[in-house]
Amino acid sequence: MANYTPAPEDDYDVFIEDDLSDDEIEPCTPYDPKILSAQLVPYLYTTVFMVGLLDNILVVFILVKYKGLRQAENMSFLNLALSNLGFLLTLPFWAYAASHGEGFDDPLCKILLLLYSIGLYSEAFFNVLLTVQRYKEFFHVRRRFSACRTVAGSIFISVLVWVTATLVTLPELVSYKPQMQSQKYKCFFTGLHFLPADETFWKHFLTLKMNILGFLLPLFAFVYCYVRMRKTLQFRERNYGLFKLVFTIMAVFLLMWGPYNIVLFLSAFNEHFSLHGCGSSYNLNKSVQITRIIAATHCCVNPLLYVFLDKAFRKHLCHLFYLCSDTAPQPTEEPAQGASGEEYHLSS
């Protein structure tokens, strides 16, 4: 097994993957990620960065100026946009590293890993929070948690989620450090040598942590809440626009990050699935890189979903660019306690 693991500048896994240049058990040519990295990643990541930066800043502006942050869901939408922006800030650096074949020295190595990881985990957690908020609204349990729906309560929960996402990324932060390789710095996984466990254990631990917190937890929340809501007659009879938006955002997140998490799991535990042969290793390494590139583009998708599924957002966007002739909308007030999510959504 390799002593180090390349980080995203090799356009491989930021968390746990083995060095792709290692010799396999069978004599064969290993997969070289640098070919696809140099040809595709710089252009794709730069495009995603520019598009994502523009549309997520627009989301933040519209939420703050027009829709207001008095409703708990709007606060969560704002935090989702901030999560995307944090993730986006790392893409130009990975694009540069892919095109030049080199990484970064301290402290930039750890800063980029921190932004990348916090952006990913915080988006997963805020997606879960939004889903649970819609679930409680649907089954009219809002009054039991009325304190959580105040501005102060929403801010407290948001801070708690950000702190949790930061704490979750600490293992990556302490286990990565820049190393010199071929007279170039690389941001490598070196393991947690101050704890009594070998590198294989931490490789499996970090993989399972990402799979559980970044994929299985949102998947469970999505399936449980959606199935329970789908069974009720009210859900089938009424078209809840805000419900549709929240669950579509979660579904897209799962669809874009799901393949990467599955392939990552198979790659980390390949010895348990008889996937350590030459051909299997080659295909797994290639799949990890491709699915990771696809997943990294998710951070510019949410604002597009707002445009297609949120009438109020389209109206505010229209007024912002002077495409509408009627009077510009005013900032939205918090709905009354008895108002439904749909009534607020259509009037905001």
Swiss-Prot record:
UniProt record, GO biological process: calcium-mediated signaling; cell chemotaxis; immune response; inflammatory response; positive regulation of cytosolic calcium ion concentration
UniProt membrane topology term: Multi-pass membrane protein
Entry-listed glycosylation sites: 285
Top-level division of the source organism's lineage: Eukaryota
InterPro entries recorded: CCR1-9-like, Chemokine_rcpt, GPCR_Rhodpsn, GPCR_Rhodpsn_7TM
Keywords noted in UniProt: Cell membrane, Disulfide bond, G-protein coupled receptor, Glycoprotein, Membrane, Receptor, Transducer, Transmembrane, Transmembrane helix
Designated name of the protein: Chemokine C-C motif receptor-like 2
Keyword Disulfide bond: yes
Record's keyword annotation contains Nucleotide-binding: no
Cytoplasmic side: 65-76, 132-150, 226-244, 314-348
Function statement: Receptor for CCL19 and chemerin/RARRES2. Does not appear to be a signaling receptor, but may have a role in modulating chemokine-triggered immune responses by capturing and internalizing CCL19 or by presenting RARRES2 ligand to CMKLR1, a functional signaling receptor. Plays a critical role for the development of Th2 responses.
Transmembrane segments: 44-64, 77-97, 111-131, 151-171, 205-225, 245-265, 293-313
Localization of this protein: Cell membrane
GO molecular function, one term: CCR chemokine receptor binding
Lineage: Eukaryota, Metazoa, Chordata, Craniata, Vertebrata
Side Extracellular, residues: 1-43, 98-110, 172-204, 266-292
Family of the protein in this entry: Belongs to the G-protein coupled receptor 1 family.
UniProt remark on domains: Lacks the conserved DRYLAIV motif in the second intracellular loop that is required for signaling of functional chemokine receptors.
Cystine residue pairs: 109-187
Gene Ontology cellular component annotations, sorted alphabetically: cytoplasm; external side of plasma membrane; plasma membrane
